[in-house]
Amino acid sequence: MTKLAAAALALCVATPALAAKVAGVEFPDSVDVGGKTLKLNGAGLRKKFIVKVYAGGLYVVEPSRDAAAIVAADAPKRVRMVFLRSVARSQVLDAYRDGFEKNSPGPGLTGLVAKLDRIAPAIPAELKEGAEMLVTYVPGEGTTVVATGGGSATVEGKEFADALFKNWLGAHPADEDLKAGMLGR
């Protein structure tokens, strides 16, 4: 392999997704969060068995393919979900609880699960097809959840943000293919 070809390949591997379209859902290459520009790290499709549940995109300050580094960074980040089918709030919260148990076990688990009750009012009883949900972490403010047809709720602290973002990026994500997409792989 020539040096030029090797350099071009390295650049392609190191360059994050600039914009994406997943299952007909467009993800812009950047979004503004609290005066900071977050870049699209990657996007993918959440499936449950063979059913398409939502298209999801991950936005971060500094794009990376390192899931642990993204979760650990005390920097703004966002996951945008656009639902491709109707999903009940209880299903969303159950999925988050399951993710907490798999990715954040230990003595703090009970407190993390209890904090889910604080975001529940932001999620409507049913997220209809086409509904959007944003999960945004901002240092010093916490994690804010906003959903179409719902409200807005914020949970303070980075620990909750880490646990929630591990649902997509942890060692045991809800969907490996979605994780790979969000990491631009």
What are these regions (language model features)?
Residues 1-4:
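Positively charged n-region of N-terminal signal peptides that target proteins for export
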Residues 6-14:
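Bacterial N-terminal signal peptides
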Residues 15-19:
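Sec/Tat signal peptide C-region and signal peptidase I cleavage site
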Residues 27, 36, 54-56, 75-79, ...:
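Envelope-exposed proteins and targeting segments
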Residues 64-140:
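Mid-length scaffold segments of soluble, non-membrane domains
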Residues 146-150:
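Short strand-turn-strand beta-turns centered on an Asx-Gly dipeptide
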Residues 152-178:
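Flexible glycine-rich active-site/ligand-binding loops centered on an Asp-His dyad
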